[in-house]
């Protein structure tokens, strides 16, 4: 078996009747939104690029560098002085080289390889939404929400038993840094935190009403993730892992579906400064799947997002991220990356994943989540790696590979969709919110716990899971991935599969 390679790793969408090998990647596209029009106005010149300039620590350094930006042919869009990151637009092809020579600049680089767009339209791949008949047919057990019987993933992490003890605290907020969240959904509205929600697509916060929502033709990915985390236990639809906590939407994906550095930096800083306890990051930062430290542009992107994620953790947030969907061994000596840069013309390259990092997934302090299917083994697509994958949780898999027990019918993960609907998706994008939900339950149980303590409890309470050996998920007689490590910690499952019951009882 070979792993499917989706253009957008963070947004694998699998219609319920399709095998993983033919999975559709989300292409969240639409015309430019109001938030993007500001960016377009700055970038009327089609050759303009966006940059991040990372300033060395020091009194007055940021002000000095901002003046130098103008002299180098750039325009400051916004500046995050608290972490020393400046977002710049420039049409000068030598801008990065020039600004790197300025005293006080640690690193600088283009956040993309394609010019800033003025407007974009394209097609959209969608998940399979449940029909009205399917919703009506679902039979719930006493005390369950109507669609909960289809959620095999909840008992897989003992969330159903956890809910008998605690639903989580409304004082805890999980931020979904993603494609936007439809807060009008009946399963999301009761738990939505508007004050911690924002649109960061341009790299600058847009707090206008509803700016955090996906457009009508944009990806439902973020809404799906939000429901997995905190869909209310309210007699409607489905139930989230932590149905008593708050969830916010931080939109960082542009109309083309790209998660650029300036938007991701904005998202982490916003979360840091608005009381967020957990961030969920089911994406990788475009346009490079791996950002190499020996490339000046990629190093700048790595520096900027590292500063932002560390700032969020310093302010009290646990950062959780999806491991990725290419069946890569992230602990291997080398990986062949055929997809970067994904916003222009990709070229095949061989990278060392210890020096070229998937961000934010491989950043220090980030909880990296691998995916399991309905049989509790590694999903066919899930990235893995000893010392890289920290923990595992249900992200689904092709029903042909891992079929759930009745009454559940799909091996994929049920979630909320915009417009008051529910539907299935699969990917490490779906595994990560399960862990974010468990982290929120731990924070609810231990309200004064630091991010370090929450992570320590998350790992200690995970159910140790031994390597699946040999791993031949499609039963073709060929090994599809090799798991290294012990039962207590290995490359497929990290410290184990997340445990929601322990999160509320220990």
Residue ranges and their predicted role:
Residues 45-55:
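Short glycine-/aliphatic-rich beta-strand segments at the starts of folded cytosolic domains
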Residues 1-35:
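Secretory targeting and sorting signals
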Residues 252-359, 363, 416-434, 489-490:
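Substrate-binding/access-modulating region of protease and related hydrolase catalytic domains
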Residues 34-44, 77, 276-284, 446-506:
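C-terminal subdomain of the subtilisin-like protease fold in secreted/lumenal serine endopeptidases
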């Amino acid at each position: 078996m070979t792993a499917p390679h989706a253009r957008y790793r963070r947004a694998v969408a699998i219609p319920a009747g399709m095998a993983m090998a033919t999975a559709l990647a989300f292409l969240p596209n639409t015309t430019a939104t109001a938030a993007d029009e500001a960016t377009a106005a700055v970038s009327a010149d089609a050759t303009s690029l966006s940059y991040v300039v990372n300033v060395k620590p020091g009194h007055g350094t940021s002000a000095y560098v901002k003046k130098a930006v103008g002299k180098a042919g750039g325009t400051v869009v916004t500046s995050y002085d608290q972490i020393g990151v400046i977002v710049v637009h420039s049409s000068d092809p030598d801008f990065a080289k020039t600004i790197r020579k300025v005293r006080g600049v640690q690193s600088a680089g283009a956040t993309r390889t394609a010019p800033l767009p003025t407007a974009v339209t394209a097609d959209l791949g969608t998940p399979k939404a449940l029909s009205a008949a399917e919703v009506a047919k679902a039979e719930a057990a006493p005390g369950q929400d109507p669609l909960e019987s289809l959620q095999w993933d909840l008992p897989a992490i003992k969330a159903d038993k956890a809910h008998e003890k605690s639903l989580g605290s409304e004082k805890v907020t999980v931020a979904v840094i993603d494609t936007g969240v439809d807060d009008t959904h009946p399963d999301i509205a009761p738990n939505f935190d508007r004050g911690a929600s924002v649109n960061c697509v341009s790299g600058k916060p847009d707090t206008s009403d509803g700016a955090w929502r996906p457009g009508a033709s944009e990806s439902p990915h973020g809404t799906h993730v939000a429901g997995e985390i905190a869909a209310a236990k309210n007699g409607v639809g489905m139930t989230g892992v932590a149905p008593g906590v708050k969830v916010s939407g931080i939109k960082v994906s542009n109309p083309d579906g790209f998660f650029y550095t300036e938007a991701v930096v904005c998202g982490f800083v916003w979360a840091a400064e608005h009381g967020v306890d957990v961030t969920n990051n089911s994406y990788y930062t475009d346009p490079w799947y791996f950002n190499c430290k020996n490339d000046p542009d990629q190093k700048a992107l790595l520096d900027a997002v590292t500063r932002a994620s560390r700032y969020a953790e310093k302010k009290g947030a646990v950062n959780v991220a999806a491991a990725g969907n290419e069946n890569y061994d992230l602990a291997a000596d080398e990986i062949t990356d055929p997809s970067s840069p994904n916003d222009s013309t990709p070229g095949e390259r061989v990278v060392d994943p210890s020096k070229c990092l998937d961000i934010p997934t491989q950043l220090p302090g980030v909880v990296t989540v691998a995916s399991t299917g309905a049989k509790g083994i590694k999903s066919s697509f899930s990235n893995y790696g000893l010392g890289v994958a920290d923990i595992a949780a249900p992200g689904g898999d092709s029903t042909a590979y891992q079929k759930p027990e009745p009454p559940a019918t799909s091996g994929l993960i049920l979630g909320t969709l915009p417009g008051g609907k529910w539907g299935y998706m699969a990917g490490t994008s779906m595994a990560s919110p399960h862990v974010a939900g468990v982290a929120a339950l731990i924070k609810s149980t231990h309200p004064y716990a630091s991010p370090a303590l929450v992570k320590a409890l998350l790992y200690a309470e995970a159910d140790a899971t031994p390597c699946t050996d040999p791993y031949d998920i499609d039963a073709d007689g060929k090994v599809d991935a090799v798991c290294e490590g012990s039962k207590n910690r290995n490359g497929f499952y990290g410290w184990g599969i997340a445990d929601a019951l322990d999160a509320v009882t220990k």
